[in-house]
Design a protein with these regions (language model features):
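C-terminal amphipathic alpha-helical interaction region
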Residues: 46-241
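Single-stranded nucleic-acid nicking/binding segments centered on His-rich, glycine/basic loops
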Residues: 40-44
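An acidic, glycine-/histidine-flanked metal-binding catalytic module
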Residues: 1-36
Length: 241
């Protein structure tokens, strides 16, 4: 939800305005505009490093942010410890946004939701591959094998080059799928032993998501070779077009 980043941004803006208000509170009215401009220049000079006018969606900004010493927290497990940092807790409490207990509870809830969501996705992926996709894969392999055998029976010197080529690729994909399924299942079982919420979320990010990508690759490769009639669910092209 955009509500969460907006809470953080609005709290940060409130703190900045509060600091500005404190600095200008005792300034004489006739000098207010001049002092305000001086303060703006000072703040701009101090915080210019966060201003970037290039393309923020490319690696250009990533490299520039690193050069400027700015955070680049790419995942929730990397980012969540920041919410518990002392200065951030004090900021939320100062503006009556969250109490320390509320911050700690949100920390645990966000991490738990993150881990549970990835677990559900991983289990769903395993079910789709094991119960549905592999059936279609093996059925098509069987059909190709039967076709090659029948051609050989009719034409003894038939090379069956196409069937052999596809079968070779499907066999390699099938082997990779089997190994990837085993690894994902094994690593999912290992996550059940982790009790710390941050360590668990980190394991789901670093290991389970990587396992899912590793499983998807051979499935996608095989899917490109399998006719739609053998697939138990619509392909991307069918869903999109």
């Amino acid at each position: 939800s955009v509500a969460d980043p907006n809470v953080v941004l609005n709290t940060a803006v409130a703190e900045a305005l509060d600091q500005i208000c404190e600095k200008l509170a005792d300034v004489d009215k006739k000098d207010l505009e001049e002092e305000a401009m001086k303060l703006v220049k000072k703040l701009l000079k101090k915080h210019r490093r966060i201003i970037f006018n290039g393309n923020g969606y490319t690696d250009e900004w990533v490299a520039e942010a690193e050069k400027r010493g700015l955070y680049n927290l790419k995942s929730l497990p990397e980012a969540m410890p920041q919410i518990k940092a002392k200065k951030n807790k004090e900021l939320f409490e100062k503006h009556h946004v969250f109490t320390e207990i509320e911050i700690d509870s949100r920390y645990e809830i966000y991490l738990e939701n993150y881990s549970k969501t990835i677990r559900i996705e991983a289990l769903t992926m395993l079910e789709m591959v094991k119960k549905d996709f592999t059936d279609g894969l093996m059925a098509y392999e069987t059909a190709l094998t039967d076709t090659a055998i029948q051609k050989k029976q009719v034409l003894a010197d038939a090379k069956c080059t196409l069937e052999t080529s596809i079968l070779t690729k499907l066999d390699a994909a099938s082997e990779a799928i089997g190994l990837a399924v085993e690894k994902l299942e094994k690593d999912l079982a290992e996550t059940q032993k982790i009790t710390d919420s941050l360590a668990l979320a980190t394991a789901y990010h670093d290991t389970i998501l990587a396992d899912m990508d590793a499983l998807r690759a051979p499935v996608d490769a095989a899917e490109e070779m399998i006719p739609e009639t053998y697939l138990p669910y619509p392909t991307y092209s069918k869903l999109l077009f």
